[in-house]
Amino acid sequence: LLRCKAEMARLKHEGKAVNPDQLLFGINQGCTFADLRVEHMKQIADLDLDGYAIGGLAVGEPTEVMYEMISQVEPHMPKDKIRYLMGVGTPGNIIEAVARGVDLFDCVMPSRNARHGHLNTWSGIINIKNAKYERDERPIDPACGCPVCRNYSRAYIRHLLKADEMLGMRLTVMHNLWFYNHLMERIRDELDAGTFTAFHDRYVKLLDTRI
C-alpha cells in the first residue's frame, strides 16, 4: 500500500494520474478482518479518488460476514464518493448492501442464472425448466414490463431452453437484466420517497426465495 500511495503521488505530481475519460476507484481489501479493512479504507480514502470499492467479499464468504464487513468499513468511506460492492449479487444482497450505504454493484449472476433457466420475478425465483411450466401460458412475471414478458409465455421459453435454442437464452438474459435494472430503479425511487425501509422489509427475503 505504501508503494501504491507513493506511485499515486508521483503520477498526480506529473499530472497524468488518471485518464480524464474514466473513473479511478480505490479497492478496499482485508479479507474478513474488520481491523485490517478499516485501516486500509482510512488510508486509501486519503487518495481522493473518484470512488471506492469493497472487494474480496463475494468469493465464498458467508453473506452475514459480508454484511458485517460492509457495516464496519462504510463509516470510513468518503460520503461524497461512489461506494461500489464488487461481484454482488442476488437481489436480496443488493437490498441489504444499499441499506448499509452501497451505491453500485456488478455481477454475472443475472445473465449466468438466466442461461440456466433461473429467472427473477417480484414473487421470487423460478426455474423455467421445471415440468410445471410446460403448458404455462403466463409471462415469466405478470408484474414485469420487459419485452419478453409482454410477448412470450413461460411454456414457449421453457421449450426454447429444453430444445437448446439460442433464442431461449437471449430471452431469459434479457428478462433478468431488465429485472435487475428495474430493481435498482425501484430502490432509487424508494430512497427518494423515504420508504426504503418498508421496501427492504417486504422484498429482501422474498426476491431470493425459490418458488
What are these language model-derived features?
Residues D141-I211:
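C-terminal extensions of enzymes
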